[in-house]
Swiss-Prot record:
SUPFAM superfamilies: Translational machinery components. Keywords: Ribonucleoprotein, Ribosomal protein, RNA-binding, rRNA-binding. The gene is rplR. It comes from Rhodopseudomonas palustris (strain HaA2). GO terms for biological process: translation. Belongs to the universal ribosomal protein uL18 family. This is Large ribosomal subunit protein uL18.
Length: 120
């Protein structure tokens, strides 16, 4: 494993450990960001199941002409995820940025999810 991969894995683990301490049974909003797409899901760690998910690969996103590599797509994914989570009865989550900096696409997704009804 390269030094960069080890550093990223440690950062991701450190963030997840801190989240477990503060979660208090709340579901986790997990974000994965690749160079071309962005994915997000609300996970109930106590049951081990995904409650809601959204990504820039979905048909509705592709038809709108959004690629996942920009802030507009991240906002759309955040809004879609929040709507699906609220429909499932989830209103409070813990934000898991997954070791990514809270900046750019990750921040845009989080802000859109907040505006659409999720609180964290």
């Amino acid at each position: 494993m390269s030094k960069l991969n080890v550093t990223n894995a440690r950062r991701k683990t450190r963030v997840r450990i801190a989240l477990r301490r503060t979660a208090n049974g709340r579901p986790r909003l997990s974000v994965f960001r690749s160079s071309k797409h962005i994915y997000a899901q609300v996970i109930d760690d106590l049951k081990g199941e995904t409650l809601a998910s959204a990504s820039s690969l979905e048909k509705s996103m592709r038809e709108a002409g959004n690629t996942g590599a920009n802030i507009d797509a991240a906002k759309a994914v955040g809004k879609l995820l929040a709507e699906r989570a609220v429909k499932q009865g989830v209103k409070e989550v813990v934000f898991d940025r997954g070791g990514y900096l809270y900046h750019g696409r990750v921040k845009a997704l989080a802000d859109a999810a907040r505006e659409s009804g999720l609180s964290f």
